[in-house]
Swiss-Prot record:
Protein source organism: Lycosa singoriensis (Wolf spider)
InterPro entries (UniProt xref): Spider_toxin_CSTX_knottin (IPR019553), Spider_toxin_CSTX_Knottin_CS (IPR011142)
Protein name: Toxin-like structure LSTX-D2
Database matches in PROSITE patterns: SPIDER_CSTX (PS60029)
Record-stated family: Belongs to the neurotoxin 19 (CSTX) family. 01 subfamily.
Disulfide bond sites: 48-63, 55-72, 62-87, 74-85
GO terms assigned for molecular function: toxin activity
Superkingdom, natural source: Eukaryota
UniProt domain comment: The presence of a 'disulfide through disulfide knot' structurally defines this protein as a knottin.
Keyword list, A-Z: Disulfide bond, Knottin, Secreted, Signal, Toxin
Length: 115
């Protein structure tokens, strides 16, 4: 039984060592590839539509707030026949952002007190 445990520990150690070396070699090549792809992607990135601006040309182009992406909301003004679309933040996401901000500030105060 002791021999079996000893061999299993030895096997796991050698296996983890060999896999980390293979991963390290893969990571260096993969990092270079990803950096070149990200550079190309940043060039292609289009500008986002700010909040309360017209988004009828591209309904998925609204900018992100601190935590969530704004949503393109379309409506018909009273007495109008044409549709108006603007980037807006839904109320429930607005309240969630405010709550997260207050929790973050409260966490900072606690860290000061006990830190």
């Amino acid at each position: 039984m002791k021999v079996l445990v000893l061999f299993s520990v030895l096997f796991l150690t050698l296996f983890s060592y060999s896999s980390t070396e293979a991963i390290d070699e893969f990571d260096s090549d993969a990092e270079d590839d990803m950096l070149s792809l990200m550079a190309n992607e940043q060039v292609r990135a289009k500008a986002c539509t700010p909040r309360l601006h017209d988004c009828s040309h591209d309904r998925h182009s609204c900018c992100r707030s601190e935590l969530f992406k704004d949503v393109c909301t379309c409506f018909y003004p009273e007495g109008g026949d044409n549709e108006v679309c603007t980037c807006q933040q839904p109320k429930h996401l607005k309240y969630m952002e405010k709550a997260a901000d207050k929790a973050k500030k409260f966490g900072g105060k606690i860290k000061k007190w006990f830190g």
